[in-house]
Structures are given as C-alpha cells and as structure tokens.
Curated annotation (Swiss-Prot):
Keywords tagged on the record: ATP-binding, Ligase, Nucleotide-binding, One-carbon metabolism
Protein's pathway: One-carbon metabolism; tetrahydrofolate interconversion
Name this protein carries in UniProt: Formate--tetrahydrofolate ligase
Residues binding ATP: 65-72
Top EC class of this enzyme: ligase
InterPro entries, sorted: Formate_THF_ligase, Formate_THF_ligase_CS, P-loop_NTPase
Signal peptide coordinates: none
TM ranges: none
C-alpha cells in the first residue's frame, strides 16, 4: 500500500493554467507560483461577482479521534466524485499549519487518492501566506514595543497588552516569555507570549475580509491592549493598519491548486476550529460559488465547533448558506465515543458502534436546527466490518438521515460517487431554510448559553470572576453585539475532553473572554484549551527527510 506522499509523487500534474481554464480563468487572471500553484487576481474576483451563485456543501464531522476522521479527504473526494457525475465543482479548504504537520498529523492535504496537489508544497511553505500572517502579527508586536520604548504617547499599560507574538510551530516553551530585557537600550521589560500563527487574529481577519479596504478596516479595529485608564487601544490608534495590510497584500488573494483528478481547489487561510473559527477564507468560498455549480468546503473538527462557527460566524458573510451538510463519521470514532479504548478501535465491536451513535445523532440534530439537511458519510477504513457498517446504516435510517459509504481514500472519485449522488438528490428534494442559532442582539451570556444548551446540551454556564469582569468591560465598550467564538476541546461536547459520546446535564465554565474586534467576534475560552500547542512524544517530524534530488519523505 502506497503512502500519501508516494501516491502524490506518482501523479503527473497538469499546469494550473490548464486546470482552471474550464472555470473561465485565463493565464492573465493568475499570479503564478511555478507551474502548479497560483493566486487569483482581484480583477478576476471582482469580474465574477455578477455570476450566479452555485450550491454550497459543508463537510463537518462527529467528535474525532486524535488522528482525525478524514474530513479533508472526504471533502476532496466528494468534489472529485461530483465532477465525475457531471457537476461543475470546486473545492474551498484551509491551508495546513506547519505546527501540526510536524507534530501529530504529518500532513493535511487529504489522503490516499483524495488529495490536493502538490501536497509537499501545500503542507510546507506553499505560497508564503502563513509567513506573511506571522510577519504581520510580529510586526505589530514590534511596533507596540517600539511605541512603549519611544515614550508611550498612547499611555499603553504594558501589564494589559493583549497582543502576542506568533510562530507557525507547536512550541510549548514559548507560551510565556519576557521581552525587553538587557537594559534601557532594549525596550521596556514586560511579560509576553507566543501563540501558533493560526490562532492569530490576523489569520481570522484574512479569512473574513472581502477586499483590501475591508482588510485595513478590520486590522484597524484590532484591540491590542488597554491604557492606564482602562480604555482600549487599537491598531488604528497606532496608525499602522496600512503597514500591516501592505505585508498581507498578496496573502489575501486565494490560492489555486488541483486534486489528483484535476478538480480545481482553493486552499486559503487556516484558522483552527477549537481556538478560532475554523473556516477557510470568505474570499475563496465566495469566488468558488461564483465560478462553479457546486462548491465543497469544510469546517474544522466536529460539528459542535467548526460547523457551528461556519453557520453563525462565516455564513452571514457569504452570498448564500449551505444547501447541505455532510457529516463525516468513522467506525473507529463511533467506537471511541462508545467507550472503546484507543488501542482497541480496530477490533469489531457492534455494540460500541450502537453506543457511539448517540454522538452522531446529536450532530445530525444540531445541523437540522440550522434548517439545513444533513447527509452522513461513512469514511471507510480497512478495519471496518460488514456488521459494523450494517448497524450504522440501520441506526441512520432510524433517524431518517441519508447515509453512504465512501471509499475515496482507496478508490478516489469512484469511491465517492454514491455519496455525491445522494448529496445532489438531498439538495434537490430538501431545500435548506437556513437560520442562525442566536440573534447577535442577545447579551454575551445569553449567546454563550444558547450554544452550550442547544448545541452542546449542557445544563449551565459558569463564568469565572475574570470572565465576569471582562463581560462588564465588553458591555461598557459596546462590543456585546458581536457573535461568540467558543474555544473548547474538540473531543467532547463538554469542556472535558474525556466526556465522550453524548454527555448531558454538564456545566461548562468560561474562564476568559477575548474581544477580537478585527475578526468581529468574541472568543470565549473554556477548559485548558491552549493557543500554542505542544509536540507529542514522537512528533511526525522524526519521520521526515529530503533526499539529495529534493524528493520529500515522511509526509503522510
């Protein structure tokens, strides 16, 4: 059995100019990064805005195992299958973060015969967007520290600076640092810290901005900290939004690549769904909707995180809402949610599938609350048994949700045809009637309680003293009408990563609220969610290498 990287390297890529020709995109519309990668020009993005809007398919998942359940793989395979059955389809997905690639995932460009290519480039430096975001973020940090050093005209309280530096790696040693040491020539000493780049507000802004002017407006709105009198200080107060936008002027343009089967794909932006909103860029998704009849996109982690944020935060910024939501389920994740230990997930256990179905059922119910039809995709693994698949199909039938087995990892486009046909049929026969979970006019507490009680099925929300103080400050500053972005473990509906399945009557504790005015939401932090991950005991980096001819080894 070939590895993902071996499959990717065996494919003869088409020039990206030829791949996108069928979408009406010409050579002059592209800014090429070699033969197989390109950015789409703003002139072309504006030119297609008058085109009809196609159908939107959102791919999400049940609460996952640590290895993930193959959402990206299913997204890519479904799009390939839709093209195979004659539907003009595009993909709009996130760019991988180098931290998890070097850490646990080893790659995040799909898998098997459902990959976006060139996968080595996409998983590593790609077109430099991550570096541009990192640079813009850290340029702001440098400008803040310089302002303090040069007399602090804005009277920024260095004890209340919210803005952190970032790096696109998992590096727990950088979570808490002290800067400005070494005497008066080296700045003002203060506590600081690093987040991973994908947790930066600038990443969220890039993924929500619609053009350069909107980018500058959002950058200016970033709250970097507070003055001695407790009033907020913004990037606009520092007058550096133009400089930051300049660094991002190319990064904001969507990246175009291809799948193994030649399906055009936007890969742009990459916020995590547990600590940010978990969706690719609005620009990429919107442009795909104007170029294709069907656009397949994804939202990070389980539907309790990524899909909720897609529907409550991203969708209001799109020209349409999803016409269907595909929920990816694997038998191994169902068994884990049914109480099976991680080292026994490959063993047949029909009763554990039955027990774990409660998790999938809740995700289906939640998607239906948004007025959107759901389809379950069983992402097939070699350890799956006929008995387990049969019982899962029986359970899905009991709640009247369409279900299809998908083998896109092993069989590519052909392995997703049944799923593609079911999704098209579902869209045709069950028109979506999208509605948001909550009204932004509700109070901060009420919006959080809506998410916790209706999506997670908790019974109560507790606000720690720090969070209560921050809510009062948010209200005082007039920020309380923004949507909520929950920062929560991806493994459970609750804030306890060990409470698997479908827990009920639990309490969730909000420990901190962080206003992200540039992004346009408030982050509510729960549990011990980290904005800078650490590496596992045996990071994927240990298996990576490059040969003398440049051949990449170990990405998977």
């Amino acid at each position: 059995m070939k590895t993902d990287i071996e499959i990717a390297q065996s494919i003869e890529l088409k020039p990206i100019v030829d791949v996108v020709e069928k979408l009406g995109i010409s050579y002059d519309d592209l800014e090429l990064y070699g033969k197989y990668k390109a950015k789409l020009s703003f002139d072309k993005i504006r030119a297609v805005e008058s085109n009809p809007v196609g159908k939107l398919i959102l791919v999400t998942a049940i609460n996952p195992t640590p290895a993930g359940e193959g959402k990206s793989t299913l997204t890519i395979g479904l799009a390939d299958a839709l093209n195979k059955i004659g539907k003009k389809t595009m993909i709009a997905i996130r760019e991988p973060s180098l931290g998890p690639v070097m850490g646990i995932k080893g790659g995040a460009a799909g898998g098997g015969y459902a990959q976006v290519l060139p996968m080595e480039d996409i998983n590593l430096h790609f077109t430099g967007d991550m570096h541009a975001i990192t640079t813009a973020n850290n340029a702001l940090s440098a400008l803040i520290d310089n302002h303090l050093h040069q007399g602090n005209e804005l009277e920024i309280d260095q004890r209340r600076i919210l803005w952190k530096r970032v790096v696109d790696l998992n590096d727990r040693a950088l979570r808490h640092v002290t800067v400005g040491l070494g005497g008066p020539l080296n700045g003002i000493p203060r506590e600081d810290g690093f987040d991973i780049t994908v947790a930066s507000e600038i990443m969220a802004i890039l993924c929500l901005a619609t053009d350069i002017e909107d980018l500058k407006r959002r950058l200016a709105n970033i709250v970097i900290g507070y003055r001695y009198d407790r009033t907020p200080v913004s990037v606009g107060d520092l007058q550096v939004e133009g400089a930051l936008a300049l660094i991002l002027k190319d990064a904001i343009k969507p990246n175009l690549v291809q799948t193994i089967y030649g399906t055009p794909a936007f890969v742009h932006g990459g916020p995590f769904a547990n600590i940010a909103h978990g969706c690719n860029s609005v620009l990429a998704t919107t442009t795909a909707l104007h170029l294709a009849d069907y656009t397949v996109t994804e939202a990070g982690f389980g539907a309790d995180l990524g899909a909720e944020k897609f529907l409550d935060i991203k969708t209001p910024n799109l020209p349409t809402s999803p016409d269907a939501v595909v929920i990816v389920a694997t038998l191994r994740a169902l068994k884990m949610n049914g109480g099976v230990a991680k080292d026994a997930l490959t063993e047949e256990n029909v009763e554990a599938v039955r027990a774990g179905f409660a998790n999938l059922k809740r995700h289906v119910e939640n998607i239906r609350k948004f007025g959107i039809p759901a389809v379950v995709a069983i992402n097939e693994f070699v350890s799956d048994t006929e008995a387990e698949i049969a019982v899962l199909k029986e359970l899905c039938a009991s709640i009247d949700v369409p279900v299809e087995l998908a083998s896109v990892w092993a069989d590519g486009a052909e392995g997703g045809v049944a799923l593609a046909e079911t999704v098209v049929k579902t869209i045709a026969e069950n028109p979506a009637n999208y509605k948001r979970l909550y009204d932004n006019a509700l109070s901060v507490q009420e919006k959080i309680e809506k998410i916790v009680t209706e999506i997670y099925r908790g019974s109560k929300v507790n606000f720690e003293k720090k969070a209560q103080t921050q809510i009062a400050q948010i209200v005082q500053n007039g920020w309380d009408k923004l949507p909520i972005c929950m920062a929560k473990t991806q493994y459970s509906f609750s804030d306890n990563p060990n409470a698997l399945g479908a827990p009920e009557n639990f309490e969730i504790t909000i420990r901190e609220l962080v206003p992200k005015l540039g992004a346009g939401f408030i982050v509510a932090l729960t549990g011990d969610v980290m904005t800078m991950p650490g590496l596992p005991k045996r990071p994927a980096a240990l298996n990576m290498d490059v040969e003398s001819d440049g051949t990449v080894l170990g990405l998977f």
